[in-house]
């Protein structure tokens, strides 16, 4: 029970499996369960009987339309989390988000907020993002709190605020919550690899237009030259966003390499053609390399001093779902191997 890993392919498992996990946690003496409640889980009634003590809202962007049909249906499923929060529970909301009022109206429990707006329960006063850390000033109950966070990116200033306010809302003392922040590491999220090279390599889970845009905007605030992106789109999933991802990447990155990413039963070439559908006649800073291992190697081989290679879409996942079955594949391991291959060719020893 000291270490638990959910190897289930679903973000939120089916209800019978979920309850078996709860039983296991209870037998181990756990008092709290933190989980991600996906829109699909509400759509498929996996969470129908669960009431939440605490629910946290970050943002809503178009996603999973292959399941929900329309964006309105998607939002309706997202709101179920807050409707299923206990009356004596707490809803932690991003007050700066455009859908804040709609989410607030759905809340069954007490509402507390975070954001830059002066009305926020936990206000983001200011912050400065550095290449290795972020210095943040939050305001809580008229006290300004300085936080030195290992998490990078503007969006993580918000994510950390959400987590901190959530902890405070369930009774964790402020000093105890703050003491945990320096040790936070989120595998597969803004993972800057230790490559000992004049260029940088980062692995991240970003796979939606919004997530990719935020990531690339952050990366270009750093002292880098070119950004080289390796990314694909999943097969048998929301095909509407494929050309949107293509546009976002070529508009915000120096060069893009489109490749496969869990193609499942679809032809990876067809998926890549969907990605470039709206950019093929107007942009030329991209190429298609179907094999993901080859795509990663090509990106590494292209990198020059102060360039950054961004391998996106899978994060710390350890599989690829192909037509022939599921195979082991980890982007971080592949990146390290690609760097080693290049060093060997160039006679670099470290």
PLM region descriptions:
Residues 28, 43, 51-201, 224, ...:
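Acidic, Mg2+-coordinating active-site environments of NTP-dependent enzymes
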Residues 6-38:
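Conserved nucleotide-sensing/catalytic segment adjacent to the nucleotide-binding pocket
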Residues 13-16, 35-41, 72-76, 182-186, ...:
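Short gly/ser/thr-rich secondary-structure transition/capping motifs
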Residues 1-3:
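Short beta-strand-centered segment that lines the nucleotide-binding/catalytic pocket of NTP-utilizing
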Residues 35, 55, 93, 113, ...:
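Structural beta-sheet core signal
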Residues 31, 53, 89, 254-256, ...:
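Conserved acidic residues
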Residues 108, 162-174, 179, 184-185, ...:
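ATP-dependent carboxylate-amine ligase
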């Amino acid at each position: 029970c000291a270490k638990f890993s959910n190897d289930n392919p679903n973000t939120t498992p089916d209800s019978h499996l979920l309850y078996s996990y709860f039983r296991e946690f209870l037998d181990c003496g756990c008092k709290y369960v933190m989980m991600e409640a996906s829109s699909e889980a509400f759509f498929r009634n996996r969470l129908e009987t669960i009431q939440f003590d605490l629910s946290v809202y970050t943002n809503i962007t178009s996603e999973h339309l292959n399941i929900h049909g329309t964006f309105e249906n998607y939002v309706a499923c997202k709101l179920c989390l807050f409707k299923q929060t206990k009356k004596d529970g707490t809803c932690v909301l991003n007050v700066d988000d455009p859908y804040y009022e709609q989410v607030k109206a759905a809340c069954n429990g007490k509402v507390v907020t975070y954001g830059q707006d002066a009305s926020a329960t936990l206000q983001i006063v200011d912050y400065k993002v550095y290449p290795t850390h972020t210095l943040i000033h939050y305001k809580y109950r008229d006290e300004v709190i300085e936080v030195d966070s290992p998490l990078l990116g503007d969006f993580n200033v918000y994510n950390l605020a959400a987590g901190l306010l959530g902890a405070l809302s369930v009774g964790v003392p402020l000093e105890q919550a703050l003491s945990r922040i320096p040790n936070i590491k989120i595998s597969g999220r803004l993972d800057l690899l230790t490559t000992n090279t004049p260029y940088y390599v980062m692995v991240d889970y970003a796979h939606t237009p919004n997530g990719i845009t935020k990531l690339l905007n952050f990366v270009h605030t750093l002292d880098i030259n070119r950004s080289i992106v390796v990314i694909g789109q999943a097969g048998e999933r929301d095909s509407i966003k494929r050309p949107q991802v293509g546009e976002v990447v070529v508009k915000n990155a120096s060069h893009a390499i489109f490749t496969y990413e869990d193609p499942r039963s679809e032809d990876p070439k067809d998926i890549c053609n969907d990605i470039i559908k709206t950019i093929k006649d107007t942009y030329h800073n991209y190429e298609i390399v179907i094999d993901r291992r080859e795509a990663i190697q090509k990106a590494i081989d292209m990198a020059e001093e102060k360039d950054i290679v961004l391998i996106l879409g899978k994060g710390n996942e350890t599989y690829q779902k192909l037509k022939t079955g599921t195979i082991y594949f980890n982007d971080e391991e592949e990146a390290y191997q690609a760097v080693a291959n290049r060093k060997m060719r160039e006679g670099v020893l470290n």
